Amino acid sequence: MKELIEYIAKSLVDNPDRVQVTELQGEKTAIYELRVHPDDLGKVIGKQGRTARAIRTLVSAAATKQNKRAMVEIME
């Protein structure tokens, strides 16, 4: 899952070397913290949060397939 988030984020940003994903694992839930360069934050969030919502939907669908829950938090 972490690799999926990194791949999507690196495809969107101008500074792919500054993309960082941290995984916090629980029993049934995983929280992924996505950090990008401040200049790329708008690209990852998107207009009215649409890109961020799409990333969260993809990750949630992939996690559901593994009978888990996953949340993506975009950090500054």
Language-model features and meaning:
Residues 1-43, 52-76:
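RNA-contacting regions in translation and RNA-metabolism proteins
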